[in-house]
Structure formats: structure tokens, C-alpha cells
Amino acid sequence: MNRRRFLQGSLAMAALSGTTGLSTLFSRAAFAADSDIADGQSRRFDFSVLQSMAHDLAQTPWGGAPRPLPNTLATMTPQAYNAIQYDAKQSLWNNIEDRQLDVQFFHMGMGFRRRVRMFSLDSASSQAREIHFRPELFNYNDAGVDTKQLEGQSDLGFAGFRAFKAPELARRDIVSFLGASYFRAVDDTYQYGLSARGLAIDTFTDTPEEFPDFTSFWFETVKPGDTTFTVYTLLDSPSITGAYKFVIHCEKSQVIMEVDNHLYARKDIKQLGISPMTSMFACGNNERRMCDTIHPQIHDSDRLAMWRGNGEWICRPLNNPQKLQFNAYQDKNPKGFGLLQLDRDFSHYQDIMGWYNKRPSLWVEPRNQWGKGSVGLMEIPTTGETLDNVVCFWQPEKPVKAGDELDFKYRLYWSAQPPVRSPLANVYATRTGMGGFPEGWAPGENYPKTWARRFAIDFVGGDLKAAAPKGIEPVITLSNGEARQVEILYVEPFDGYRILFDWYPTNDSTDPIDMRMFLRCQGDAISETWLYQYFPPAPDKRVYVDDRVMR
């Protein structure tokens, strides 16, 4: 695992993999224009054609690193790159009256070096035309770009695209595909957050991580009033190729993507990640180590949620560990999983720049049988909010061999809340802090003599109120140490129950402690399962130090 390379990819600041060699795959024919910016000649296209392209491409060697950009683009600063704006009057569907959707393209430059080709597709005739780069499509403003270096560069291509929805057809985008195979979407807050990827390769292995590229896109022309659009894309990398179909529903409160992919392995792959997503967790209620700012919490996502194939619901709060951690949660035919941002209270963040309280959750819903495998979760130490440090994906159990063909179908929900929740009680929040004293008697002059760590897990919903008179039983499992001072408290402000317990070490090990808890009433589970990973301090640090200065 090359951490530097991963961080570059997670920021989508560099396209790190292959060219497509598509020039030999397109013929020339007449075409009836469906977009007035498409200027290429036509070729028949549909999803089966794309699958054949990806299959054939996998039989050839990878095309290698991207070619150099013109110097005026290669040396751009982020500020200069952001100054380049697409001309909204030349958007993909600007000639369609009463359109509800539109598409604009990102310019090449800075870290975005991989040429991406764009095509307009008339689905009625199955004819596609390429949209070639030309400087007239962009406004360069104060970017300092020497446009003379771009003249005659029709094969320069684009870096990616973004989609807009009425009434914000040219001002606030709702979907963005930019860099490698990264893409994002928003809910009704118009606030971007975590990202998804087309594919992850060797994220946590003894070889450098590989970042496949989306190298070409085909856009089906929308009709007036449509709020759904379809785009096809070709994926390429040293180890694999892929044909993808995205049907993107731009609803009022969320964006839903139906994804179909067909994958063709060039090489053996140690670790294949399906439907990967990338997020950031610097600090939160449960992890305060990096929160010495005015902001109580800083994160794009607060938990990994899983709906296992056997019906069990899992809540796993995220961490910012002191060293890289990778966990694999085994499953068979999962019903869904995702990185969620469920805490939407502004007062918990106090951030008017990042607006973390508005960031969307991302939920994956498999649409075919995925078989045996695991949900992989990687957490990387970070000292701030500018680098993504959380990765999540589905890893098939069966190793991928050269020549293998795979297909996965799934839905992605970009929304404030996932489309489904457990009917049982849900985890509301997780907190940790000093332990070893009675709740309500925080140490004053005398600190506890025995060191312990307290955990408070809040549950809401389900049948908690009905279960309370019968008796609620926390079922706690630990990989090491002991749980003591277990308490169950009703908390009126959020109308739920808080489970308290103190973790006491029983040896000097500093290995991560895997914790598991659910609530039971008369033998039946009444809550989803809470999972957590705690990192105990070294034995010589397991003491309380009173560093107060009495004045």
C-alpha cells in the first residue's frame, strides 16, 4: 500500500492510470446531430458495443502513463485551474428547450493529465459523435493560460464532467466525475462530501494501489422534462478494463445511480474493491484526539453501516487511528452498506466553510447476488480535514485471475438518510472518555486510582420504550479486557437510552480492542449491533495525571 499515492488519488488530483487506444475502435459515418457541440463523425454505439470494447482492450497491453500536457496547463496552480470556467452557452444539451438537466465539461490541467473523451449519443438511432476539445468551449478569465498553446489540440480531451439540474442549470452542479474513476453527487443541500470510485485495486496489499481511469463517456441525449440521464463509460488500468452503465436519477431530495459494470481482468489481482467510496474522518464524539480547534467535530462521514445477508444491521463508528487500520467484515450476498453522515446538527460542527452537517450519506444496494466476500474498511491517520482517510468497498472472496470476467449491479443513494434503516433500535451516538468513577461524580480533587476507559452508546427508536419495563440487557463482547460498571440510562432530550460501560485492561497489550454490543430483551435482539475498535494506550500511560493549576 503506497499511502502517498492513495492520498493523491483520493483527492482526485492526478489521473494515475492508462490510455485507451480507442482511435482504432471508431469508424466514420454520417450523423444527424443531437447536440450542437458534437463535431465528430458517427459510430454505432450501445452497451453491448462498449462491453466488446472493454473485452478487446483487456487482450492488449495497457497503454501506459498519460502523455505530457502543454506547459501552460501542466504548471497551473489550483487557483488558476479553478478560474477556468466552461461556457454555459455551449453546454451539452443547450439546444434542448425546457430541459431539466445539462452537462458541462472540466478542462485538462494541473494534476488532471489523463485525456478523457466525450461522446453524444442518440439512443433512438444508436449513433454516437465525439465532442472534441476546443478553447472556445471555455472562459479562461484570469487563469493565465496561453491559449495559443491549445490551438489545434482537438485531441486534448477533457478531464471530466459535471451535471446540473433546473432551476440551477448553470450555477450549482449535482453530479461530478473528475479524476481517475472518482465521482460524487449531492442531496438537496447541494453540498458535496464523500466520493465514490468505479473500482479499487490493491488498496491494502503489499503492492502499490492502482487507480483505474474512466477514459471515455457516452451521454444519451435527454428529452425535455427528463430528470434522469444515462451515461456509459469505459474503465482502463494496468490490471483490468470495464464497461459501465450509469442511470442517474436526479430527484428533488437525493441522487440515485443505477450502476451496471462488466469487468475484464488483464492480470491477477490481489484485492479487488467493488463500489468503493472514500471519505474523511478527523474527529468526532468518539475520537477527540485531533479536535483542538473551534470545531467540535470534523468529518464527511461518521459511521460505516451494514445490512448483512443474514439480516443483521451493523453500526461501526469511524476512527482516526494513530496508525493505519484495515478491517474486513465477512458476509454473503450483502443487502447493503455505506458510509453515513447522520449527525445533521450544525451546533455539533460549528463550521460555516465545510458545512459538514449538510454532507450526504452514500448507501450501496446490490442488485444481483454478490456471493461471499467482505466489506473492507481502511482508516488512515490524518492531522486535518484536507486529506481523505477512510476507504470502504466490497471485496469478493474468490481471487481474481487474468482472463476472469465479472459483473456487478448496484444502486448508489446520495442522500441525507439511507433508503432503509433497521426496524430495531439504532445507534444514535458514540462517546468515550475517562472511566473508573460513578457517573455524575466526575473527578474533582481526587482522580480514580485505577485507569479505565468509559464508553457511552446511545440508542433510539425501535421498541425500546416497550422493552424497558421488561428489562433491557446490553450484550457486550470484547476481544480483550473486561467491561465493568455497566449502566442503562434513559435520556429524555433524545428520547432514547444510553448504555455506559468502562473498559478495564487485563494485560499490557496495545493491540486494538474489538468491541461488539447489542441490546436484548427476554432473549430477543432489540437493536442493531454496535461495533467499535479501541486503541489502548501503552501500560505506562494508563494513569490519570492531574494537570490542573489551582489559582
Swiss-Prot record:
UniProt name for this protein: Glucans biosynthesis protein D
Pathway where it operates: Glycan metabolism; osmoregulated periplasmic glucan (OPG) biosynthesis
Signal peptide extent: 1-32
Gene3D superfamilies: 2.70.98.10, Immunoglobulins
InterPro entries xref list: Gal_mutarotase_sf_dom, GH-type_carb-bd, Glucan_biosyn_MdoD, Glucan_biosyn_MdoG/MdoD, Glucan_biosyn_MdoG_C, Ig-like_fold, Ig_E-set, TAT_signal
Function: Probably involved in the control of the structural glucose backbone of osmoregulated periplasmic glucans (OPGs).
One GO CC annotation: outer membrane-bounded periplasmic space
Molecular-function annotations in GO: carbohydrate binding; catalytic activity
Principal subcellular localisation of the protein: periplasm
HAMAP family attached to this UniProt entry: MdoD_OpgD
Keywords associated with the record: Periplasm, Signal
Transmembrane segments: none
GO biological processes: beta-glucan biosynthetic process
PTM per Swiss-Prot/TrEMBL: Predicted to be exported by the Tat system. The position of the signal peptide cleavage has not been experimentally proven.
Domain of life of the native organism: Bacteria
Family, per entry: Belongs to the OpgD/OpgG family.
Localisation per UniProt entry: Periplasm
Pfam families: MdoG (PF04349)
